[in-house]
Regions:
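Compositionally biased, low-complexity segments of secreted and virulence-associated proteins
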Residues: 1, 19-21, 140
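Boundary/junction segments of secreted and surface-exposed precursor proteins
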Residues: 1-11
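Extended charged/polar low-complexity repeat regions
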Residues: 4, 26, 32-34, 43-45, ...
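Short aromatic-glycine motifs in intrinsically disordered, low-complexity regions
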Residues: 9-19
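Predominantly extracellular/luminal regions of secreted and cell-surface proteins
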Residues: 17-29
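A secondary-structure micro-motif
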Residues: 50-52
Length: 189
C-alpha cells in the first residue's frame, strides 16, 4: 500500500514459515523511503529478524523491521531514556544491552564497547517464546525458535539463501544492491 501522506510504498511477504507452539516465519518487508539502506536483503528491504542497536556517546538507536527506529538519549548518570510515552526502555549490564517493550518482549544485544553496532542475541516474550540468533563473524547465520531453525547463506554481504530445518529454502538474487528475484521452495519466482 501507499501512504497517502508521505507517498511511501510499503510491502511485506512471508516466504517460509515453520509451525509450532510459536511459529518461526521468514517475512520480507520493503519500504520505499528506506531505499538507500541495505540490511543484507537489498536496498529498502528488511526482514522480521532485522534488529540492530547502534550506540555512541550520546544516544542509542534501536532499529526494527519495517524501518522503525526508537532513539534513546544517554542521561548524565549513564542510563538511557527514550522519548516520553515510548513503549521501550533500555538497560545496560556489564555484558549486554537489554531493551524491553511494555508488552513484555525483551531484546538482548551483546555489549561491545569497541563497536558502535551491537549484535542481537535473543528476543523473548512473556508467553515463553524465544528466538536465539547465531553468527558467523558479523553476519547472522541462523535464528532458532520453538518451531525450528532458519539458516542464512551469504554471498558477500547479501543473503542468497534462507533454509528452514525441514530442508525447504528460498533463493535470493541481486543486481548490485538491488534484490531482483526470489525463488520459493517450489521453484517459482
Amino acid at each position: 500500500p501507499v501512504n497517502l501522506l508521505t507517498g511511501s510504498f510499503s510491502w511485506n511477504y512471508t516466504d517460509l514459515s515453520l509451525y509450532g507452539r510459536h511459529d518461526l516465519p521468514f517475512t520480507r518487508y520493503y519500504e520505499s523511503t528506506a531505499f538507500e539502506q541495505d540490511h543484507h536483503f537489498g536496498n529498502g528491504f528488511t526482514t522480521n529478524y532485522s534488529y540492530e542497536l547502534n550506540v555512541d556517546l550520546l544516544y542509542a538507536d534501536f532499529f526494527m523491521p519495517h524501518n522503525r527506529h526508537v532513539y534513546f538519549s544517554m542521561m548524565p548518570d549513564g542510563s538511557y531514556r527514550a522519548k516520553a510515552g515510548s513503549a521501550f526502555s533500555l538497560d545496560v549490564t556489564d555484558t549486554s544491552y537489554v531493551i524491553r517493550h511494555r508488552d513484555g518482549t525483551t531484546y538482548i544485544f551483546d555489549r561491545n564497547d569497541n563497536s558502535v553496532s551491537q549484535k542481537i542475541r535473543s528476543i523473548s516474550s512473556l508467553d515463553g517464546e524465544q528466538i536465539v540468533y547465531a553468527y558467523n563473524g558479523d553476519l547472522i547465520s541462523s535464528v532458532t525458535g520453538d518451531a525450528g531453525t532458519l539458516t542464512f547463506t551469504y554471498s558477500g554481504e547479501h543473503v542468497t539463501r534462507v533454509t528452514d530445518s525441514t530442508g525447504r529454502s528460498i533463493t535470493l538474487s541481486y543486481d548490485g544492491e538491488l534484490l531482483t528475484a526470489v525463488e520459493n521452495p517450489d521453484g517459482d519466482s
